[in-house]
């Protein structure tokens, strides 16, 4: 979203060749920042003080067979949940056929507008859909799909995005439940139940394909899990003194 606002201001066209390198560097930077944060946390600072690096970061203890089985079962139920969510599309729908609803038609035209205009800003990037008026409209989904679509493949890219959003949905639900409870039954059942819910994904991604709204919805469980873990860690560091270190 930040890039969609910055690029028009800097007169940089929104296309894969200009956006993907920035996203790639951001990913690498995030990984490096996480690694430094982890090292700072387990080592009590950045100074080695004569301690070997391997000892400073701690030796990773291999997980046992029981834990490995639980992880495998969890990912197995995530796969089942995804297949349940995606089966109507995979078994019936042709990826080359546009969804016969008014909302998907609007959003596919939005992707076309970005491909032609090279402007993905929420502050007017879809102006061609509003008679040239630069109105505010959230363009996160449109901007992302435009990176993978060509002028003749917007329909296919949009339909594939439904499958990607379904995967994010069931993974996020599993992540959220894993930080809320230690119940293995709940953890294994959640992705399967989540894949069969009527509102999401059946209605939002199969019946009406409300892609931008669905994008916001599927991100909620995973982001909630991240904030819960971060909040617990911050609370623990404050409780035991020393303040929040990372």
Please provide the spans of the model-predicted regions:
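Membrane-interface transmembrane helices that cradle and orient dolichyl/undecaprenyl
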Residues: 220-245
């Amino acid at each position: 979203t930040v890039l969609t606002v910055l690029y028009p201001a800097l007169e940089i066209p929104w296309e894969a060749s200009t956006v993907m390198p920035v996203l790639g560097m951001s990913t690498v930077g995030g990984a490096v920042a996480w690694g430094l944060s982890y090292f700072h946390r387990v080592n009590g600072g950045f100074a080695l003080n004569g301690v070997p690096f391997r000892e400073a970061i701690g030796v990773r203890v291999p997980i046992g067979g029981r834990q490995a089985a639980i992880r495998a079962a969890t990912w197995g139920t995530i796969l089942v949940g995804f297949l349940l969510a995606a089966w109507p599309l995979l078994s019936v729908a042709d990826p080359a056929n546009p969804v016969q609803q008014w909302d998907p038609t609007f959003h596919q035209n939005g992707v076309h507008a970005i491909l032609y205009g090279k402007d993905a800003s929420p502050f007017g990037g879809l102006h061609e859909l509003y008679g040239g008026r630069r109105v505010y409209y959230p363009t996160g989904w449109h901007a992302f799909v435009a990176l993978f679509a060509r002028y003749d493949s917007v329909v296919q890219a949009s339909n594939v995005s439904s499958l990607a959003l379904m995967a994010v949905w069931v993974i996020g639900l599993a992540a959220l439940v894993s930080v809320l409870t230690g119940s293995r039954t709940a953890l294994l059942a959640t992705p399967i139940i989540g894949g069969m819910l009527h509102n999401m994904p059946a209605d939002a991604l199969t019946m009406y394909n409300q892609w931008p709204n669905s994008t916001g919805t599927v991100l909620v469980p995973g982001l909630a899990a991240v904030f819960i873990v971060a909040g617990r860690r911050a609370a623990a560091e404050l409780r035991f003194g020393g303040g929040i270190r990372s």
